């Protein structure tokens, strides 16, 4: 079973990790055959997404009998000693990894970012209040629509809709509302592939950021935010949990009609265990935090991500227009790289089919924009991005 899990590759070039890739052998040649059943693929899914192989193997080794406890984490009571230690270590490691100040709470919540789009409104504003939203793509649009249900005014203070969400409006042009309770951004748009490169200066207003798709991809200046939130299923762990980092002074002001599960004070007072939490996702996320610490922290993570993104963007930019990135170069995402083929829809279809046959999984662009998209989160090895770039070059040579 372990052998299959590792996905030992056959000889020759293939678009998936094999024994050579894990040893640093970056020799690549086009395979042209579908990977054998049981081999691991290069998974470019936008989420749920690829997880670190060593973390998966640790989970596999402990799955039936966790650290000699006689049971699986899947079976443990969240109130039991073993699980309480797992949960406490996960929070401690996350605080160390990110450098979270003592005046911020860390909440491990069910529902993901979509739920927190609503719970932020319940905790930070009354129904008669206003909040400002910067629209840079599908997820910030979704957050604003949720805010419009719960606030008197969910003001669109800036939008790049006219540019098809391929850029980010300059902060000096944002039309912020007097007295607004918070300013909401999505730090990285998974679908459109645009990413904030600096924390926007909104003065003394409360900045709220959905970081679902670039959580832990680089250092975070936590003190510049009031709330940082996001689902973990893209860059941290399996689906089923969101992590919310909230400044203390923003806790305890929830509306009277706020559901208990949305009330940040209730969740903080109960150490995120007001009800049974998403235990297994929390556990695996904790393993990822520990791994990132061991691997050098977020500065090292960022450097690896820059190198990976450069490989892919260089493949696009040096293709003489064969591959096209629609995104403003100033705001290109390190995590999600959408691109099209200048040859049109039929050629894109052929590209995606060949890529899948060679072990490059989930490259199809989001249904709302089409084209292709490679999500290259923390756990995607550089060898995977290099293999994709090589395949792209080869495909062009055969089809130009």
Which positions does each model-derived feature cover?
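PLP-dependent enzyme catalytic core of the Aspartate aminotransferase-like
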Residues: 41, 366-400
